[in-house]
Structures are given as structure tokens and as C-alpha cells.
């Protein structure tokens, strides 16, 4: 136990609280059993736990009634261990030679590599003999039994290798049409072509079907908008606003009174003037005719309009430009080519059967008959007899 920490100064002794005695639960009949432990809050169990324990005890009793040695683990341990030892002994007897698990496969692979090396060396020796070109043909050749055995093994290895190559060639994926078709389709969908191209084509077809009903309505609307848009005036245009007013067509006369025109004299009924209008008329003083104010005021200059000198050259160019514009307006516009709508383009072309039949008859009429062929043949023989046709030699 660790020593209590040291404290310095005035130490006041604290009063220890008295320990409380455990609370005992009185029995039903007022008598306490000494054999049983006192029931405290820690060892009290609920009714459900007691019920489970009682059920387990009943199961144990049933099992013991069927087999008295069912819970005798120490007595059964020797039997269990004896069964395990018997199984190990059987496995040991079956594996008398104690063959390795992977050694046999490794030995076979080593023998195969040796045969490959012998085959390689033999091909190399054959090439060297071909280069010698019979230089050592007069010498004796010694062949041992081991060499013959080695040659036989190499021959078997080559035959086995040829069979494997033929089998692999026959079962190759490249020669399987089904796999080839699937691989080609995958390449087309994933590599050679954008995978979203099919979706885009479907969306375009849907849009075309929607526009079939509308026809050329959108194109007609665009043409009308272009015609209705006023021509923008350029800052370099020399035409004044007076010329524009003169070029405009005269407007129809307007009535200055309400109602319809009748036969005879139509009197204009004047409206009664208000008090403010009468005051304005009374205060109005007309200017004399000799006043400079009556002189025509120049029209307000438009934004971006530049004043230019009126030279004879400029006026001549202006007159020529006006003349060209008048001739253009008088000349009839060439007829516009009819626009074929998208709906007409998508419709299948109609084939005139009568015209097609006439064309076929004209083609067949140009063919030679047997009589024409015989006549041409006779003419050829006549020209050859006369020496006009020289046969090729």
C-alpha cells in the first residue's frame, strides 16, 4: 500500500461516519434461516432469470436420464484422444513413401527445360554442319546409346509440342466467330466510336419528328422578321432628313372632325374653349411678318450626323447614287428558289413507274438481235477477204 501523502500545517481530524449494517429482509413467517445467505440488492434475481435456470436444469436432468455419462468429460477424454491417434496412424501408414507435394512437378518442369535446351543445341549443330558443306563427311561418326535415347526424348518432346500448338491454334479465340463478333462490337462501341453518338442520333430523330408537323413555319417567320426590320442608318450616309421625308409616300388626308361625310355642306362643330385656353389666347402676341423668326429653322441634326461641304463633285456622286437606287427599286426582283422543307427531305422519293418503264424499253431497244449479229458477222468476213481487216499475229 502506498503511504498517505504528507500534509503540513494545522490538520483537523475529520469525524468518521459510522458504518451502516446490512439491511435484512424478514421472512414471511418471521423466522430467519441461518443456512441461506441474506438477500441483498446485488444477488436479487428477476423471475425471468429464475425461469430460464429452472428450464436448463430440467433439460440436464432429461439428458442424464438418457445417458448417465453425458457430462463425464474426464472419463470420455481418453476415448476421444484414442480416436484421434488412430486417424493419425492411418494417415502415416498410407504415406509410406513420404512423397513431397511439389517436388514431382518441379522435376518434370526441369526435365522439360532440359529437352528444350537439347532441341535448341541440335538445331544449332544442324546449321553449323550446313555451313561446313561436307567438309567432314569422310570422318567416322560415333553414336552412343545415351545420345540415341536423348534424340528419342527430343523427338517425343517435339511431337508433344506440335500437338499442343495445334490444339491451341484450334481453340484460339481469334478463330471463334462468336467471340470475334462480340469483340468487334465492343471495339466499335467503346473505342472506334463515341458511346454517346447513338444517344445523340436518337435525340436528333426525335427532334426531326417533332419538327415534321411544323414544316417551314419557322423559316417563314424568320423571313418576315428580316423584311420588317428597318434598315439601320449609317453615320457616313449623306442623305438628310428632308430627302427621307420627300422620298416617303404621301399620307392619306385625315378628317379634323368626328362623324361621317354627308352630302352637302359638312359643318365642323368647334369645342367650347376652357378658361385656361382663353387666357392663353388673350396673352398671345403675334410677331410681325418682317421678323427673322419666321425664317425656316434648320432641322435638328441627328446623333452621329456629320456636316460636309456641298461641293459639285459630292453633289454629283450623290445624284448618281440616288439614280442607282431608283433603278434597283424599279427592276423586278428575281424569283426566289423554293426552299425544300425538312419534312419533304425525309419523305421517300416517289418513283414514276411509267417513266421508268419507258427508260427500260429505250435501253432494251438498243440491244442487237440475232439477225443484227449475223449481218455484222458477214460484213466482218467480207472486209477480211478484201484485206481491210488484218488479223493480229
Curated annotation (Swiss-Prot):
Assigned keywords, A-Z: Coiled coil
Biological processes, Gene Ontology terms: regulation of alternative mRNA splicing, via spliceosome
Low complexity compositional bias, start-end: 39-48
Segments forming a coiled coil: 76-166
Superkingdom assignment: Eukaryota
The UniProt record lists the keyword Coiled coil: yes
Family of the protein in this entry: Belongs to the NSRP1 family.
Region Disordered: start-end pairs: 1-49, 187-350
Basic residues compositional bias, start-end: 199-209
Segments passing through the bilayer: none
One Pfam family from the record: NSRP1_N
Keyword Coiled coil: yes
Basic and acidic residues bias locations: 222-236, 243-261, 317-333, 341-350
Natural source organism: Caenorhabditis briggsae
Protein name: Nuclear speckle splicing regulatory protein 1 homolog
Amino acid at each position: 500500500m502506498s503511504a498517505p501523502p504528507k500534509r503540513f500545517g494545522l490538520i483537523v481530524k475529520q469525524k468518521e461516519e459510522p458504518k451502516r449494517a446490512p439491511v435484512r429482509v424478514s421472512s414471511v413467517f418471521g423466522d430467519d434461516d441461518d443456512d441461506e445467505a441474506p438477500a441483498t440488492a446485488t444477488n436479487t434475481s428477476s423471475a425471468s432469470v429464475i425461469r430460464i435456470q429452472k428450464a436448463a436444469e430440467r433439460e440436464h436432468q432429461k439428458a442424464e436420464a438418457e445417458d448417465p455419462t453425458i457430462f463425464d468429460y474426464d472419463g470420455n477424454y481418453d476415448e476421444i484422444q484414442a480416436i484421434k491417434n488412430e486417424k493419425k496412424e492411418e494417415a502415416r501408414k498410407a504415406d509410406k513413401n513420404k512423397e513431397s507435394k511439389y517436388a514431382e512437378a518441379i522435376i518434370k518442369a526441369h526435365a522439360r527445360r532440359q529437352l528444350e535446351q537439347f532441341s535448341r543445341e541440335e538445331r544449332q549443330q544442324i546449321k553449323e554442319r550446313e555451313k561446313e558443306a561436307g567438309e567432314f563427311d569422310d570422318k567416322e561418326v560415333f553414336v552412343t546409346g545415351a545420345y540415341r535415347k536423348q534424340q528419342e526424348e527430343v523427338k517425343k518432346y517435339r511431337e508433344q509440342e506440335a500437338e499442343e500448338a495445334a490444339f491451341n491454334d484450334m481453340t484460339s479465340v481469334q478463330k471463334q466467330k462468336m467471340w470475334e463478333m462480340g469483340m468487334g462490337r465492343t471495339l466499335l462501341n467503346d473505342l472506334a466510336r463515341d458511346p454517346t453518338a447513338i444517344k445523340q442520333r436518337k435525340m436528333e430523330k426525335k427532334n426531326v419528328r417533332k419538327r415534321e408537323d411544323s414544316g417551314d413555319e419557322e423559316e417563314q417567320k424568320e423571313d418576315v422578321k428580316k423584311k420588317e426590320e428597318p434598315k439601320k442608318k449609317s453615320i457616313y450616309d449623306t442623305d438628310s432628313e428632308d430627302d427621307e421625308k420627300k422620298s416617303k409616300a404621301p399620307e392619306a388626308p385625315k378628317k379634323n372632325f368626328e362623324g361621317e361625310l354627308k352630302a352637302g355642306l359638312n359643318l365642323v362643330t368647334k369645342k367650347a374653349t376652357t378658361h385656361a385656353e382663353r387666357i392663353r389666347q388673350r396673352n398671345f402676341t403675334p410677331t410681325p411678318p418682317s421678323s427673322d423668326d419666321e425664317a425656316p429653322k434648320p432641322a435638328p441634326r441627328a446623333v452621329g450626323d456629320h456636316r460636309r461641304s456641298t461641293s459639285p463633285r459630292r453633289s454629283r456622286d450623290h445624284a448618281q447614287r440616288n439614280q442607282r437606287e431608283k433603278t434597283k427599286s424599279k427592276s423586278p426582283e428575281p424569283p426566289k428558289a423554293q426552299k425544300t422543307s425538312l419534312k419533304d427531305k425525309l419523305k421517300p422519293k416517289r418513283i414514276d413507274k411509267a417513266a421508268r418503264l419507258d427508260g427500260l424499253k429505250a435501253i432494251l431497244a438498243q440491244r442487237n438481235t440475232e439477225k443484227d449479229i449475223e449481218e455484222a458477222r458477214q460484213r466482218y468476213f467480207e472486209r477480211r477477204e478484201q484485206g481491210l481487216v488484218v488479223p493480229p499475229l
